[in-house]
Amino acid sequence: MDIQTFISNQASERQSILTKIHNTILENDKSVEAVIEPMMGNEMIIYKAKNSMKYGLASVKNYMSLHLLPIYGSQPLHAKYQALLPKASFQKGCINFKDEAEMPIDIVQQLICDCAPIDLVKIREDYLKAKKAKK
């Protein structure tokens, strides 16, 4: 399935915000490519950098979710956007929302711009090198 088919298969009231978030991710983080893949039992749009998931965009029964691995590892980023998006529901590495009122696209754009420079693969490689050096 391609991205447009995935979005068009969602409830009509969700299609606009899903499209806006999808485009915002691709426009503001040039390191990622989008694919449809299963995660946590559901197909979603997975945005991969260096063949590793960086973001995910899902639409499930009662809400939509923007998964952001950069905020999972950054408490300051998590706290910043939790304050900027008070109507959304924050988890460790994702933001659940029901509509654009809970997830204004201008704030999403700032969020992706803050996440874009974070190289998760390099962070992991550096961690593993440091761990190996301690042995």
Language-model features: where?
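Charge-dense, helix-prone N-terminal extensions
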Residues: M1-K135
